[in-house]
A protein has these predicted regions:
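Mobile active-site "lid"/loop adjacent to the S-adenosyl-L-methionine
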Residues: 191-221
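S-adenosyl-L-methionine
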Residues: 155-189
Length: 252
């Protein structure tokens, strides 16, 4: 984030994407772009990307009354790229995919999951592009069931499984994860490793209590489909919920 809350820059091979959603950041970028020597100039000199793509959009900007902007900020070419992280390959679309195209912030945690996955049956909940599940398979997981409410996300994850040659050990379902976990529990399907990487559960302060209930519910349901001695890997990206409150919800 370069020390600026609300500003995210992601470099993937020779393509750079950025998005911002907080008040003041848009003006900061306008000032940067208008200066003779800008931060974008410095990024070009340092990384020489073929394309810098802006995605400043979403509910946060609308709440603040900020205009949305989406498109090339510098350079030209296709906003689609194939990347490799830790030997795992992903097709990335910074134009149509989530935020900046791929969530690189969970790379370290994916590596931890990879080290725990050998021989395990895995549930990749809120799978997005399939990152956690594919790292698990790279670490020797027996099989992965990936679930996301977004059908395009599941299809992207399916394509990424094919890209890595692991389609035979990967299956995906486009379904609300809360309901999917109930169904799995009721039919007795269990997993050695359950991964829960949910989207933000609160967009405003008024939504914090509902978000905490959501974390309690989803993690209880995740535990309900674990084998005895199984592992639950869970996370939060809800900015309005601090770590102490989140851990308290998990203990509940």
């Amino acid at each position: 984030s370069l020390g600026q809350p609300g500003l995210l820059l992601v470099l993937a091979d020779m393509e750079e994407a950025f998005d911002h959603g907080r008040p003041g950041v848009g003006q900061l970028l306008l000032e940067l772009v208008d200066r003779p020597v800008t931060s974008l100039d410095l990024l070009e000199r340092r990384f020489r990307p073929r394309l810098i793509y802006e995605r400043s959009e979403g509910g946060g900007r609308r709440l603040e009354g900020l205009p949305e902007r989406k498109g090339p900020a510098r350079g030209a070419g296709s906003p689609r790229e194939e990347i490799e992280t830790d030997g795992v390959r992903f097709a990335v679309d910074v134009e149509a995919g989530p935020k900046t195209g791929f969530f690189l912030d969970q790379r370290r945690n994916r590596g931890i999951v990879r080290g725990l996955a050998e021989g395990k049956t895995v549930l990749d909940g809120f799978c997005a592009a399939g990152g956690f599940g594919l790292y698990a398979l790279a670490g020797g997981a027996k099989c992965v069931l990936a679930i996301d409410a977004s059908r395009p996300a599941v299809e992207t994850a399916r394509a990424n499984a094919a890209l890595n040659g692991v389609s035979g050990r990967w299956e995906g379902e486009a379904e609300d994860l809360f309901q999917a976990l109930r169904n799995l529990r009721d039919v007795g399907r269990r997993f050695d490793l359950v991964i829960l990487d949910p989207p933000s559960f609160a967009r405003s302060r008024e939504g914090r209590e509902g978000a905490l209930r959501g974390y309690r519910d989803i993690n209880r349901m995740g535990l309900s489909v674990l084998t005895p001695g199984g592992l639950l890997a869970t996370s939060s990206c809800t900015q309005l919920i601090d770590v102490a409150k989140w851990k308290e919800a998990l203990r509940d």
